[in-house]
UniProtKB/Swiss-Prot annotation:
Keyword Mitochondrion: yes
Protein's name in the database: WW domain-containing protein WWM1
A Pfam family reported for this protein in Swiss-Prot or TrEMBL: WW
Subunit structure and binding partners: Interacts with metacaspase MCA1.
Positions of modified residues (Phosphoserine): S75
Domain WW: 9-43
Phosphothreonine PTM sites in chain numbering: T78
Classification of source organism: Eukaryota, Fungi, Dikarya, Ascomycota, Saccharomycotina
Stretches for region Disordered: 32-116
Length: 211
């Protein structure tokens, strides 16, 4: 407990009271032995401090604070005040949102897709039949050759017959029955040219696509 420096204690003879500023208390020195101690020696008295004790001042201050404080509200008055305050304030009602029945979530049905048709079998590839034009060409050439040979033989026979008539019959005038010699009566030239002779037969038969 802190002690006051202005109120020194009264010690017996042979003792001295010294105030310690660091600890704010008194310690006592024995003058005969020059030793010090914190405990007061026997016979030490303390003078009465000036002014009223601290407890009286505290009671007065607490009484003054109690007089100045506002009167407490009773338990009956508090609900009335609150009821009046509630009556003055307008009441706002928030409309409740209608609750709709919850239906189970519908599951969408997706039809299964039909399986993809199997790939159509590939058509077998058949090579085109060899054209018979070449064969027909050979046949035509052969037929042309035969016709040419026949015409040549026929023309030669008629030419020989004409020479025989010209040499042995005597008359200068040559009678042409079927006009085999052409219009100009060209003799051998007309016979070979009109009938085709060997030229036409060989040209058609051997100059074609056979070789």
């Amino acid at each position: 407990m802190a002690q006051s420096k202005s109120n020194p204690p009264q010690v017996p003879s042979g003792w001295k009271a010294v105030f310690d500023d660091e600890y704010q208390t008194w310690y006592y020195v024995d003058l005969s032995t020059n030793s010090s101690q914190w405990e007061p020696p026997r016979g030490t008295t303390w003078p009465r401090p000036k002014g009223p004790p601290p407890g009286v001042n505290n009671e007065k201050s607490s009484r003054q604070q109690a007089d100045q404080a506002p009167p407490p509200y009773s338990s009956q008055s508090t609900p009335q005040v609150q009821a009046g305050a509630q009556a003055q304030q307008p009441r706002y009602y928030q409309p409740q949102q209608p609750q709709y029945p919850q239906y189970p979530q519908q599951q969408r049905y997706y039809p299964q897709q039909a399986p993809m048709p199997a790939a159509a079998p590939q058509q077998a590839y058949y090579g085109t039949a060899p054209s018979t034009s070449k064969g027909s060409g050979h046949g035509g050439a052969m037929m042309g050759g035969l016709l040419g040979v026949g015409a040549g033989l026929l023309g030669g026979a008629m030419l020989e017959h004409a020479f025989d008539d010209h040499n042995y019959d005597g008359p200068d005038t040559v009678v042409v029955e079927n006009n085999y010699y052409g219009d100009d009566a060209g003799g051998s030239d007309g016979g070979f040219d009109d009938a085709g002779g060997f030229d036409g037969g060989f040209d058609d038969g051997f100059d074609g696509s056979d070789f």
